[in-house]
Amino acid sequence: MAAITAALVKELRERTGEGMMDCKKALEKAGGDIEKAIDDMRASGAIKAAKKAGNVAAEGAIAVKTDGKSAVLLEVNSQTDFLALQDDFKNFVAESLEEAFAQKLTDAAPLIASREAAREALVAKCGENVNIRRLVRVEGDVVGAYLHGNKIGAVVVLKGGDVELAKNIAMHVAASNPEFLDSSEISAEAIEREKGVFLQLNADKIAGKPENIVENMINGRITKFKAEASLKEQAFVMNPEVKVGELAKKAGAEIVSFTYFKVGEGIEKPVDDFAAEVAAQVAAAKQ
């Protein structure tokens, strides 16, 4: 019997829209076989149809709340962008955010558990899979947040400065999605990967050139990579003449951390093949 892991329960929950305990029980009964668990749930009437991998909840909304000293950034997923625009979904997100902020939650797990009944009611009403995916809570001397169209959210923690500065830098983070806070955080492995990519892409240009010229070309690319990847080295979106790190320093502030969320980031979305779907339905009808 396969181990009933939290990841397995989560996958079954995402594919069926059922509660965590129901999914765990179904997996235990099926000996850890997720496909058998789905078939058993269908047979028992617990679900109308198996929601296979195609029913991935990869749309949804990002929500954020801050009081200037702390902030919560939350992602809630739906299967379609249409549902994400509906009041029922928006209310679920807003209530979830308020609870997470009031209880100072630092992880999504307790919020998922406490909001399960409300989630199940929403799923039953809308017929779509809905999931609380992740949340982050930050605290600091000064905290600012920015939300772009409910699809991208960012929070920034400063030491010194003010909320307006933190909000402006959060806006920059939302627009630029930096990978690192500053260039010192960039690992040697990341630099080597970038070097390898550069050499592959520029093989024709490099061929036959002296070693010192090639080295200068590589160093130029790495310098540019560090500037593009690190927040402090990026040109500030509201004033490209100034780097973000310089902006903070001039205001007597230090950037402590940043967090960036984008809806569906990292979730593999299925590619719909309408022709194949119709063909499958026709074939099934002939049987």
UniProtKB/Swiss-Prot annotation:
Belongs to the EF-Ts family. Keywords: Cytoplasm, Elongation factor, Protein biosynthesis. This is Elongation factor Ts. It is found in: Cytoplasm. Associates with the EF-Tu.GDP complex and induces the exchange of GDP to GTP. It remains bound to the aminoacyl-tRNA.EF-Tu.GTP complex up to the GTP hydrolysis stage on the ribosome. GO terms for molecular function: translation elongation factor activity. GO terms for cellular component: cytoplasm. SUPFAM superfamilies: Elongation factor Ts (EF-Ts), dimerisation domain (SSF54713), UBA-like (SSF46934). It comes from the Bacteria. Pfam families: EF_TS (PF00889). Residues 80-83 are annotated as: Involved in Mg(2+) ion dislocation from EF-Tu. InterPro entries: EF-Ts_dimer_sf, Transl_elong_EFTs/EF1B, Transl_elong_EFTs/EF1B_dimer, Transl_elong_Ts_CS, UBA-like_sf. Gene3D superfamilies: 1.10.286.20, DNA helicase RuvA subunit, C-terminal domain, Elongation factor Ts, dimerisation domain. Transmembrane segments: none annotated.
